């Protein structure tokens, strides 16, 4: 088993919203690693981060990500999951979609949220810009496809991703067919 697509991006990029719609469109399950981690440890991500600190949180998160990547469906990773090298390595064989939002749009979408532990600071815009600078290269490294989400309706983002998934499926079929052709001697 392997997920049809893995969604990555900063907090507020739409991983959960788009993930639910994409899973519904494909008649698949959404596997959200933040929710898996919360269920496993019996606490919110905010509580886990506060109690364990970020390094220990990331270790626990990497374990959950490895489990999620063994499922069928659509997988939504926590925004910081890609900072862990082992997670990036695991993503190498998967269809990974980077949901890209600008700093301004990300701040707008996450403002007032109590569920985003790294953004509960005095200067959320500055912190968001810092996360963008730290993580953007990782998102680009692991992704096969990037969707710019600023100003796009969720249905349009889902349509873009569905088109990409279909392209990947057709490429794999073509490669498989080519490898099974009888070659003249």
From Swiss-Prot:
<keyword id="KW-0963">Cytoplasm</keyword>
<dbReference type="GO" id="GO:0005524">
    <property type="term" value="F:ATP binding"/>
</dbReference>
<dbReference type="GO" id="GO:0008652">
    <property type="term" value="P:amino acid biosynthetic process"/>
</dbReference>
<feature type="binding site">
    <location>
        <position position="116"/>
    </location>
    <ligand>
        <name>ATP</name>
    </ligand>
</feature>
<keyword id="KW-0460">Magnesium</keyword>
<dbReference type="InterPro" id="IPR000623">
    <property type="entry name" value="Shikimate_kinase/TSH1"/>
</dbReference>
<keyword id="KW-0067">ATP-binding</keyword>
<dbReference type="GO" id="GO:0009423">
    <property type="term" value="P:chorismate biosynthetic process"/>
</dbReference>
<dbReference type="GO" id="GO:0000287">
    <property type="term" value="F:magnesium ion binding"/>
</dbReference>
<dbReference type="InterPro" id="IPR031322">
    <property type="entry name" value="Shikimate/glucono_kinase"/>
</dbReference>
<dbReference type="InterPro" id="IPR027417">
    <property type="entry name" value="P-loop_NTPase"/>
</dbReference>
<comment type="similarity">
    <text>Belongs to the shikimate kinase family.</text>
</comment>
<keyword id="KW-0479">Metal-binding</keyword>
<dbReference type="GO" id="GO:0005829">
    <property type="term" value="C:cytosol"/>
</dbReference>
<comment type="function">
    <text>Catalyzes the specific phosphorylation of the 3-hydroxyl group of shikimic acid using ATP as a cosubstrate.</text>
</comment>
<feature type="binding site">
    <location>
        <position position="79"/>
    </location>
    <ligand>
        <name>substrate</name>
    </ligand>
</feature>
<feature type="binding site">
    <location>
        <position position="135"/>
    </location>
    <ligand>
        <name>substrate</name>
    </ligand>
</feature>
<feature type="binding site">
    <location>
        <position position="34"/>
    </location>
    <ligand>
        <name>substrate</name>
    </ligand>
</feature>
<dbReference type="InterPro" id="IPR023000">
    <property type="entry name" value="Shikimate_kinase_CS"/>
</dbReference>
<keyword id="KW-0808">Transferase</keyword>
<comment type="subunit">
    <text>Monomer.</text>
</comment>
<feature type="binding site">
    <location>
        <position position="58"/>
    </location>
    <ligand>
        <name>substrate</name>
    </ligand>
</feature>
<feature type="binding site">
    <location>
        <begin position="12"/>
        <end position="17"/>
    </location>
    <ligand>
        <name>ATP</name>
    </ligand>
</feature>
<dbReference type="GO" id="GO:0009073">
    <property type="term" value="P:aromatic amino acid family biosynthetic process"/>
</dbReference>
<feature type="binding site">
    <location>
        <position position="16"/>
    </location>
    <ligand>
        <name>Mg(2+)</name>
    </ligand>
</feature>
<keyword id="KW-0418">Kinase</keyword>
<keyword id="KW-0028">Amino-acid biosynthesis</keyword>
<dbReference type="Pfam" id="PF01202">
    <property type="entry name" value="SKI"/>
</dbReference>
<keyword id="KW-0547">Nucleotide-binding</keyword>
<keyword id="KW-0057">Aromatic amino acid biosynthesis</keyword>
<comment type="pathway">
    <text>Metabolic intermediate biosynthesis; chorismate biosynthesis; chorismate from D-erythrose 4-phosphate and phosphoenolpyruvate: step 5/7.</text>
</comment>
<dbReference type="GO" id="GO:0004765">
    <property type="term" value="F:shikimate kinase activity"/>
</dbReference>
<protein>
    <recommendedName>
        <fullName>Shikimate kinase</fullName>
        <ecNumber>2.7.1.71</ecNumber>
    </recommendedName>
</protein>
């Amino acid at each position: 088993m392997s997920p049809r697509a893995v969604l990555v991006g900063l907090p507020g990029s739409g991983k959960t919203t788009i993930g639910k719609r994409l899973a519904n469109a494909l008649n698949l399950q959404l596997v959200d690693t933040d929710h898996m981690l919360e269920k496993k440890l019996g606490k919110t991500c905010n509580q886990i981060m506060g109690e364990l600190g970020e390094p220990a949180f990331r270790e626990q998160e990497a374990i959950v990500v490895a489990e999620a990547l063994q499922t069928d469906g659509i997988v939504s990773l926590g925004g910081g999951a890609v900072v862990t090298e082992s997670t990036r390595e695991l993503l190498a064989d998967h269809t990974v979609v980077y949901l890209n939002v600008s700093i301004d749009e990300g701040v707008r979408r996450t403002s007032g949220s109590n569920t985003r532990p790294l953004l509960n600071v005095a200067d959320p815009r500055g912190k968001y810009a810092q996360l963008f600078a730290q993580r953007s290269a990782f998102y680009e490294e692991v992704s096969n496809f990037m969707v710019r989400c600023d100003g796009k309706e969720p249905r349009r983002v889902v349509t873009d991703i569905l088109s990409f998934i279909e392209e990947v499926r057709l490429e794999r079929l073509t490669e498989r067919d080519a490898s099974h052709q009888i070659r003249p001697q």
